[in-house]
């Protein structure tokens, strides 16, 4: 189907230029009695979406600068655009359960991962060719549909991907005679890019944001990322888990009760305490996963108290990277529905000993190894310290910080990006992207489940969208670890106290 689409080419914002050149991808599951009947609805929805937001039909490319400086990261229209370029429809004579079980299998001999046939594009695009910035694949099964979505990370962050899903849902449920109720417009997106590219009149300090590394070129960066990911996917295990909401709430309450004592015990500044004298559910979940992964990576931490750690662990550090949505942190704030990248990286580094057992733990007793120690006040204070540190860093990301960050990126003589080897652990939190609230209309309804299939980088975690209509729904997340670490973590008493394997994706029924 040839579609007439027109828009002016545009250069991405400063923040767009920081993102890793790959596709953010998710899968949405719809259980349906008549899945074939829903295909025309989705096809029409994608068509209406690109008519209303024509830049979504565009392609990303890096263009050499005429002055030999940084490459220009451009989104441009496609000549003779056809809908099939961004929408693929595949029919599978299998059930949803069959495909979920199939996707559990790791790749072998470096081949494609089992979910790749269900995705519109590979995770890593060909750097020598223009790349569509959006793609959809409708996978039709005997009892439902898996809608796979891919958005180019140099154009959109996870919040933007969620907004694209919500706008597609609006195009599907809206009657053909009505204009769909979209959350954004081309003009709004252009204004957001302008805001995210405003530069302060301050000198460039190359040491100001060390978490962003200089790149020789976008092409060499593509090749480096591709080599690193393809070389690891045979040794990494990706699994889906859940945590009950009431367990998270209980842990959060305990942390918040302990903050005054914790601030006093560790001699933290009162000024800091006033500004961040609380922790959120997100902080607690991040701290819990960070703790459990370190216990699995370094068994001595789980088995010994601080004073019993070997010198290499006693003096080691652990770092966590968390992309932070800055839309609401700017002044004035950007609309929540802004599609383009609006994130910066929070980087927290702490001594590894913060995750060790309480100093009084009796390691002569077998029960100490089997206990999770989370009921111990000393353990809880140390855990609270980790969660509190994350909250303090988050509270420091304000309008001034973001403006300095944007200016730093703009004034850098070369492109910058986050590389996945700069931190021990990355946690990408998609709780607020609204995918479970996306109503596609009577035939499809709202997604039953979602997942991010693209872990396969050691220590990469995706926290899935929340269900706003059900506050008691468990938290869902995907995690990728080395096989040996995954084997240890699922037998850790602390992990087992809070975390369960997601039966939808990994169950037998």
UniProtKB/Swiss-Prot annotation:
EC number: 2.3.1.-
InterPro entries on file: CAT-like_dom_sf, Sec_Metabolite_Acyltrans
Record's keyword annotation contains Transferase: yes
UniProt record, GO biological process: alkaloid metabolic process
UniProt cross-references to Pfam families, sorted A to Z: Transferase
Coiled coil: none
Enzyme class name: transferase
Keyword Acyltransferase: yes
Catalysed transformations (reactions): (2R,3S,11R)-aszonalenin + acetyl-CoA = (2R,3S,11R)-acetylaszonalenin + CoA
Record key words, sorted: Acyltransferase, Alkaloid metabolism, Transferase
Pathway, per record: Alkaloid biosynthesis
GO molecular function, one term: acyltransferase activity
Family membership noted in the UniProt record: Belongs to the fumigaclavine B O-acetyltransferase family.
Function: O-acetyltransferase; part of the gene cluster that mediates the biosynthesis of the prenylated pyrroloindoline diketopiperazine acetylaszonalenin. The first step in the pathway is the formation of (R)-benzodiazepinedione by condensation of tryptophan and anthranilic acid catalyzed by the non-ribosomal peptide synthetase anaPS. The prenyltransferase anaPT then converts (R)-benzodiazepinedione to aszonalenin in the presence of dimethylallyl diphosphate (DMAPP) via C3-prenylation.
Quaternary context: Monomer.
Stated name of the protein: O-acetyltransferase anaAT
Source taxonomy: Eukaryota, Fungi, Dikarya, Ascomycota, Pezizomycotina
Gene (UniProt): anaAT
């Amino acid at each position: 189907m040839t579609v007439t689409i027109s828009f002016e080419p545009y250069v991405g914002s400063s923040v767009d230029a920081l993102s890793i050149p790959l596709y953010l991808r998710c899968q949405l599951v719809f259980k349906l009695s008549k899945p074939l009947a829903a295909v025309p609805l989705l096809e029409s929805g994608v068509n209406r979406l690109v008519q209303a937001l024509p830049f979504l039909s565009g392609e990303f490319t890096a263009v050499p600068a005429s002055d030999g400086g940084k490459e220009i990261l451009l989104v441009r229209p496609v000549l003779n655009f056809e809908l099939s370029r961004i929408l693929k429809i595949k029919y599978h004579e299998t059930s949803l359960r069959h495909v979920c079980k199939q996707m559990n299998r790791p790749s072998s001999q470096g081949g494609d991962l089992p979910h790749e046939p269900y995705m519109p594009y590979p995770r890593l695009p060909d750097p020598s060719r223009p790349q569509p910035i959006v793609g959809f694949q409708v996978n039709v099964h005997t009892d439902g549909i898996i809608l796979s979505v891919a958005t180019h990370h140099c154009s959109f962050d996870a919040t933007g991907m969620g907004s694209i899903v919500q706008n597609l849902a609006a195009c599907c449920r809206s009657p053909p005679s009505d204009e769909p109720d979209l959350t954004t417009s081309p003009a709004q997106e252009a204004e957001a890019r302008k805001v995210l590219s405003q530069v302060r009149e301050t000198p460039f300090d190359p040491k100001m944001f060390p978490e962003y590394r200089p790149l020789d070129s976008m092409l060499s960066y593509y090749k480096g990322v591709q080599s690193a990911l393809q070389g690891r996917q045979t040794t990494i295990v990706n699994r889906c888990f859940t945590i009950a909401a009431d367990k998270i709430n209980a842990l959060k309450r305990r942390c918040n009760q302990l903050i005054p004592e914790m601030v006093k015990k560790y001699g933290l500044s009162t000024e800091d305490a006033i500004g961040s004298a609380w922790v959120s559910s997100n902080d607690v979940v991040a701290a819990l996963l960070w703790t459990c992964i370190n216990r699995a990576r370094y068994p001595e931490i789980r088995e010994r108290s601080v004073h019993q750690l070997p010198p290499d662990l006693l003096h080691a550090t652990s770092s966590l990277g968390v992309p932070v949505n800055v839309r609401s942190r700017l002044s004035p704030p950007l609309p929540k529905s802004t599609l383009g990248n609006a994130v910066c990286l929070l980087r927290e580094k702490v001594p590894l000993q913060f995750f060790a057992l309480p100093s009084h733990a009796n390691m002569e007793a077998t029960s100490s190894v089997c206990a999770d120690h989370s009921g111990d006040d000393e353990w809880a204070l140390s855990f609270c310290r980790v969660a509190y540190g994350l909250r303090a860093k988050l509270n420091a990301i304000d309008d001034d910080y973001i403006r300095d960050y944007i200016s730093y990126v703009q004034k850098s003589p070369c492109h910058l990006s986050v590389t996945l080897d700069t931190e021990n652990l990355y946690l990408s939190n998609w709780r607020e992207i609204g995918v479970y609230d996306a109503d596609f209309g009577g035939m499809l309804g709202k997604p039953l489940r979602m997942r991010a299939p693209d872990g396969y980088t050691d220590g990469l975690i995706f926290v899935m969208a929340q269900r706003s209509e059900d506050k008691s729904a468990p938290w869902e997340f995907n995690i990728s670890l080395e096989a040996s670490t995954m084997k240890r973590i699922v037998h850790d008493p602390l992990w087992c106290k809070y975390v369960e394997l997601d039966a939808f994706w990994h169950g037998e029924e």
